[in-house]
């Protein structure tokens, strides 16, 4: 949950999640809809899907017990090398280095590593250097302290902007500080290009207050979540409406929802109908008191709430 999300936002979600799924077995046996429903509002929903798949793998392949080495952990869905190393080090005391964003910054500056980390080979080279920095005399019980200290150093002292070098215990040996290159390191030139998409969103609701929602495909925007049906154009939306209903449709003010590397321009089209009807097998109608249990994307939830 803490990946890409601030602690203050996560706390409430974390507590509710553990209340509902107190162990691996209960999470593994839950439906994806239940998991996504509790995740709704946090964003980055692939984290929830991967966590669910990971629990299923641990329950099925490891009898409900997490593997304890970084190598084994990387075989689980959603766990990459750095996350695996962090779990192995912090939870099971394995002598292994991690390389999350904070640690990359600390190690790059400390050693003056000036290769572009956009290249896989260069990141591997930095990882080897991080391995070489592991304490020789470190006991197993000390590994969680070492790992957490490096992450905290990057998060609070060796920050991306305006690092607090005078507070850093490594200042006297730091190559970047000595060469006045702190602001230049680490180097990563390749960035994902921002894109934008426009979608017309059908907000169809009955007189009784039921709203049409569609289960999104397992790939793409809001994969696996329930959302309002979306179309590439107003014309495509109108084509699915019952005969004569398009004249009752009301277009309301469009808005932009910002994803990590994509801007969604959403154009809501509101239509009140006397009774429910279907445009596809993936569509269902839900009353307002059912929304809380669904995995609804944040903009969909806000739009529905704003319309009462």
Enumerate the language-model features and the residues they cover:
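Intrinsically disordered, low-complexity regions enriched for glutamine and histidine
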Residues: 1-2, 296
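Catalytic cores of DNA base-excision repair glycosylases
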Residues: 2-164, 170-183, 196, 246, ...
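Intrinsically disordered, low-complexity, charged terminal extensions of DNA damage-control enzymes
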Residues: 152-308
